[in-house]
Amino acid sequence: ILSNPLPPGTRKIGSPGIAYGNEVTILTTDLSECAVNVEGEIAVRGPNVMLEYLRNPETTKSTFHGDWLRTGDLGRKDADGYLFVTGRLKELIIKGGENIAPREIDEALYSHSDVVEAAAFSRPCETYGERIEAAVSVCEGSTLTEPDLISICIEKLGNFKSPDTVHFLSELPKGPSGKIQRLKLQETL
């Protein structure tokens, strides 16, 4: 669906490219099209995009907006049409009505050289609806503490987007593809 152009075309770091043979758009929560560089849900349509779930009209209805397939992925498109994937909709943290991408918090945690793996996730909260926690694994011999990592996040993201708690694990849970499973962290910690 997406591809980086061949030389002399431009490749952009962090982007899987632009749409070829299909269309890609970014949808707001009310399913209208987002402006350039505004994050929303990635939707695709084209001749090789599925039409429906077999014998499952309810799932088909919730997955499609007209002929646009809603992917469940979050992203943004720049002015040149390059897509940047920023996360998964079901992993989005909604704190006090504000959408917070967990990857933003991950990147703040990864900014310390002792952090080997990092993943932010949400927990229910009576005050804000959801609160932020994170899990990290650090290199052997590291003296990093929870307050150290929270301070890094506050410095880079501000207090509102920073985790309340940071869990230290020897290894974060991963799926078959090797991706860290945030939802598993929610269940097990």
Residue ranges of predicted features:
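Extracytoplasmic/periplasmic beta-strand context in beta-sandwich domains
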Residues: I1, D164-T165
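Conserved ATP-binding loop and adjacent catalytic segment of the adenylate-forming AMP-binding
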Residues: I1-E23, V36-G40, V49-L51, H65-G66
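Beta-strand->loop->alpha-helix junctions that form or flank phosphate-binding loops
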Residues: P16-A19, F121-R123, H167
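Generic structural signal for residues in well-ordered beta-strands
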Residues: V24, A118-A120, V166
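AMP-binding/adenylate-forming catalytic core of the ANL superfamily
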Residues: D30-E33, G46, L51-E52, T59, ...
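A structural motif
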Residues: I42-V44
